[in-house]
C-alpha cells in the first residue's frame, strides 16, 4: 500500500512539474547563435541545441529556415517530450506557417549521415502517460534527398521521372533516403497539426504509441511512399490508444515497390486501438 501511494504521489508530482515549470525557448536559423540564451531577443540557431537545453514540457518556438540537424547531419533527434512550433518570422513578431516556412528538408548529400528512423525522430516512450508533445507548423520534405530516374516514369512537362529505391539511384550521387519523414515512439498525448509532409522516401508519419491519444489534424500529405500516416499501439492491452485523423489532405501515396506489389496506403486503422478517421480529403493512393 505504501509503495502504491508513493507511486501515485510521484505521478502527480511529475505531472505538476511538466505543467507548472514549462519554459519557452526560441530558435532562429537566420539570426540565432547556439551560445545565446534561447530567448526571443537572443535565440538559439539550431533546433537540436534548444532540445538539449529544454526540459520535458517546454515549448520551442522556431523561425523560418531549413534546419540541418546537429553537425548538418540532415535530421533531428527529439529525446524528451517538448512542443515544436514553427512558422515564425525571424524576430518572432509574427507567425504564419504558410508564409514563414520552418523546414526539415535534407539534401541528397546528407544521406551519408541519414537517420536510422526518421528525419524527425522522437523517442519519448520512457516519459510515460503524462507527457505531451505538439508538432505544429513544419514542412517535412524529402524532395532533395530522394533520387529520381531521369527518364522512366517521367510525365510530360516534368523535370524528373519516378522515385528510385535503394540501391538503385537516378542522377544524384547517392540513392534515395528511404527513411520516414517523422518516426516516433511516444506515450501520453501526441499531436501533429498544420504540417506539410512532402515526397517522403518512406512513411510520412510512423508512430508507435503506448497509451493515451494521438491526434493528426489539419495537415497535408503529398507524394509520400508506403503510407501517409501509420499509428500503431505498442501496448499489449487493447483500447489503450485513441487515434484521431481529421481535416487532412492526403494525396498520391506511392507503393513500396516499382511493381505495385503492396503498400501505397493513405492512412490505416490498426488493431487494439480506437481509430477515428473523419473529414479528410483522401485520393489517388
Residue ranges: model-predicted function:
Residues 12-20:
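Hydrophobic h-region of N-terminal signal peptides that target proteins for export
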Residues 71-73, 94, 108-109, 114-116, ...:
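Short glycine/acidic-rich loop motifs that flank beta-strands on beta-rich extracellular proteins
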Residues 23, 58, 74, 80-82, ...:
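The right-handed parallel beta-helix/beta-solenoid scaffold, focusing on the short coil/turn
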Residues 86, 131-144, 159-171, 187-203, ...:
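Right-handed parallel beta-helix
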Residues 82-170:
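Right-handed parallel beta-helix/beta-spiral solenoid domain characteristic of secreted/periplasmic
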Residues 48, 56-96:
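N-terminal extracellular ligand-recognition/capping segment immediately after the signal peptide
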Residues 1-8:
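Bacterial N-terminal signal peptides that target proteins for export
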Residues 19-49, 64-66:
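Right-handed parallel beta-helix/beta-solenoid
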